[in-house]
């Protein structure tokens, strides 16, 4: 809690909880864990804390918590192994962040480009209203083997497209 407060006081607009192991919890345990985490951090800092869970987690459970009017979660990040487009209709508040595959970025440039084209086409198929609240990003962050050329291309093309 103190670290979240420090980051917000230092000027962060939103602090994300990156949870890479929530998918290992049984559904009942995930509910208990989210309840405790959100009560301790999210309620203390309304609309200032977002939550990202790695693939394999039941995102419906997180959405149910996000839609709770007492929680005020700023938004949620979606792993790249899940179709992001489904979540715009499922969430009623907060942002949806993601979710180009970080592994696609590590491909040779000529193999990376068609993957990026497909992602842009899929997201462009949604109207601006349908993708309202979208924060474009990666599924789980840039890997150390990622060619810088691909990162630059990704940023430039996303900015030009949206």
Located regions from the model:
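Active-site loop segments of alpha/beta catalytic cores
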Residues: 1-162
């Amino acid at each position: 809690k103190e670290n979240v407060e420090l980051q917000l006081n230092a000027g962060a607009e939103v602090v994300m909880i990156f949870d890479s192991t929530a998918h290992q919890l049984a559904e009942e345990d995930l509910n208990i864990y989210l309840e405790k985490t959100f009560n301790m951090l999210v309620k203390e800092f309304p609309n200032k804390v977002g939550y990202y869970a790695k693939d394999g987690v039941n995102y419906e459970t997180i959405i149910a918590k996000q839609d709770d009017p007492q929680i005020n979660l700023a938004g949620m990040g979606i792993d790249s192994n899940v179709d992001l487009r489904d979540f715009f209709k499922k969430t009623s508040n907060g942002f949806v962040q993601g979710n180009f595959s970080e592994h696609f970025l590590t491909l040779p440039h000529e193999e990376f480009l068609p993957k990026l084209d497909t992602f842009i086409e899929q997201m462009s198929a949604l109207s601006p209203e349908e993708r309202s609240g979208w924060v474009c990003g990666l599924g789980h962050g840039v890997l150390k083997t990622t060619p810088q050329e691909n990162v630059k291309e990704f940023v430039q093309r996303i900015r030009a497209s949206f």
